[in-house]
Amino acid sequence: RVDQLVKVAPAIIEMGCFARVETNGGGFEQVNLLFGENPNRAVREWTKPFHEAGIQTHMLDRALNGLRMSPVPADVRKLFYKVKKAQGTDITRTFCGLNDVRNIAPSITYAKEAGMISQCSLCITHSPIHTVEYYTNMALELIKLGADEICIKDMAGIGRPVSLGKIVANIKAAHPEIPIQYHSCLLYTSPSPRDISGS
């Protein structure tokens, strides 16, 4: 509920973060809807204390799918960016699970037209084709298309530090002005008795 969100905002602000995700790729304020709240009002109230503290807010965007798990018409996605900007969202973090730049390109345009910062993601995985050169070239292509920031999106938490370091170094060598963020979804589980015993 929005009253709960507003209560935890000061604690998040006190952490000293510079940005906070306010709309994830799977929810779109579904919890607010379940409680009978207007999600547009909820997002505005949720982002207000962060903006007052100088903290930017993010939204997650699945490229051609928007916030859904299936494609969204272009005119709807274009309007969506304008609505999110009006709600107080500063940055859009766009990703395509296929790492297809063609799917991300329209989001860059829509974000910039709406006055938002376009942050584009490299979805990290391991295969013979997903090399340091592959990700470097993808980042450079996204920047050429107008991306303001690059996100190293390590959703499975499998990124190898040496490889990630090389990717970042390559991007910075070509574009030192481009901010690069690392985003990981790490799930920790308690060790099993077998792990503890070492057997």
What are these regions (language model features)?
Residues K7-N24:
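Catalytic domains of carbohydrate-active enzymes, especially glycoside hydrolases
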Residues N137-H175, P179, L187-S190:
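Catalytic core of soluble alpha/beta enzymes
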Residues C17-A19, H51-T57, T89-D90, A114-M116, ...:
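Short, well-ordered coil/turn segments that N-cap beta-strands
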Residues Y188-S199:
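Single conserved hydrophobic/aromatic residue that forms the stacking wall/gate
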Residues I13-E14, K85, I143:
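Non-catalytic positions within long, well-ordered alpha-helices that form the structural scaffold/packing
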Residues G25-P106, I117, L122-T136:
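Active-site beta->alpha loop and helix N-cap motifs at the rims of alpha/beta catalytic domains
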